[in-house]
Amino acid sequence: MIDLKQYEFWFLVGSQYLYGLETLKKVEQQASKIVDSLNDDPIFPSKIVLKPVLKSSSEITEIFEKANADPKCAGVIVWMHTFSPSKMWIRGLSINKKPLLHLHTQYNREIPWDTIDMDYMNLNQSAHGDREHGFIHARMRLPRKVVVGHWEEKEVREKIAKWMRVACAIQDGRMGQIVRFGDNMREVASTEGDKVEAQIKLGWSINTWGVGELAERVKAVPEREVEELLKEYREKYIMPEDEYSLKAIREQAKIEIALREFLKEKNAVGFTTTFEDLHDLPQLPGLAVQRLMEEGYGFGAEGDWKAAGLVRAIKVMGTSLPGGTSFMEDYTYHLTPGNELVLGAHMLEVCPTIAKEKPRIEVHPLSIGGKADPARLVFDGQEGPAVNASIVDMGNRFRLVVNKVLSVPIERKMPKLPTARVLWKPLPDFKRATTAWILAGGSHHTAFSTAIDVEYLIDWAEALEIEYVVIDENLDLEDFKKELRWNELYWGLLKR
């Protein structure tokens, strides 16, 4: 469902006519070699497209106009090979709507000590050209990612590739919508939010459809489509064959087919459900939701559209990377002193992309929702480094709360727990991490990912100009409290 190859990134090289045709030709040749080399590296998720060297204000403005109008262009990378006076860039940068990365590099890795002359100095001027360019970004208060180092370095390429994945997620969010079936769970605060502001800042179009419309589609699903889907279930999962289980699984298959059809019609990238509004649905969607998340859709339970959008964004960022991403909830604690852990789960809806084993389809009673016993996938989660992230609406801005965690083995069986689960240790430790999370107002609903790291989420928040706070191994609680207070002042004063 998610294809990052559909996007491209425009590589913009700055110079000026002052240098003459011979120097400008060398600039173009060297830029072409850089871009060709980058495109040969499989680390990059999308194609990088070199545009003609930019030498005047009109050329710069025109290229940004074209980038804004091209839905394939997910972002722009700028590099000043020579000195490119930044007043020429003001009009173009002022209209730019695409995520921007400023690459501060140089064609040659080393100074040619024996042969360096003024021709070389005249050509290789990014050392001061990019400083000039950095000033105009700072002066205009523009969001951007800055990557410094030689373009052949692994670390440089890794940072560019991460940012590209983030930019793809931003473009994806601007092109699709989040479908809400029903409203938020009654009386819950943290799942609420300003949907208009979300579309302005995050690009997400969030709209509601009646559950009855989905229920009618479920009733109309042809039996042959159900049988085809059951074959797929048997291949991918450990599936029971008793009559009680099969009846429930068939109902989830119908819900999955109807949901997928509906989401495709609406060009949706994510969706929400709520157990308080199920109308004529036979079950609370469980297996169906897990399967659609596995395809790449974002999801939020109990109407949590912010969680749905964040899960989708991270799924785009992590496309084709090892690991997975899921809707998650901090459910219960293991509080042995010195080994405090969080058990993450939800009633039904945990994505199998984070499973460490072949998932089992199980059918169990669920009193919440008042419907028939729902089928769901049950498994233990993957182990290793992960992130837990939440978006909350602070009234005058969105805040992204991010916690680095370590997913650990589940060493004891839980034979009576009928839901997928993952066990993690928050960093730096349970008490400090949880204190910081609560101080920041982080939600009980999160996006949990073993596919990405914190840098992706920082890049995402900075590109979208929303607040973020990070809870990791370097946490100092007193400094964190100060950061929250300073942020309150900064975002209160900011008028953008």
UniProtKB/Swiss-Prot annotation:
Function: Catalyzes the conversion of L-arabinose to L-ribulose.
Pathway linked to the protein: Carbohydrate degradation; L-arabinose degradation via L-ribulose; D-xylulose 5-phosphate from L-arabinose (bacterial route): step 1/3
GO cellular component labels: cytosol
Pfam families documented for this protein: AraA_central (PF24856), AraA_N (PF02610), Arabinose_Iso_C (PF11762)
Keyword Transferase part of the UniProt annotation: no
Protein name: L-arabinose isomerase
Source organism of the structure: Thermotoga maritima (strain ATCC 43589 / DSM 3109 / JCM 10099 / NBRC 100826 / MSB8)
Gene name tied to this protein: araA
SUPFAM superfamilies: FucI/AraA C-terminal domain-like, FucI/AraA N-terminal and middle domains
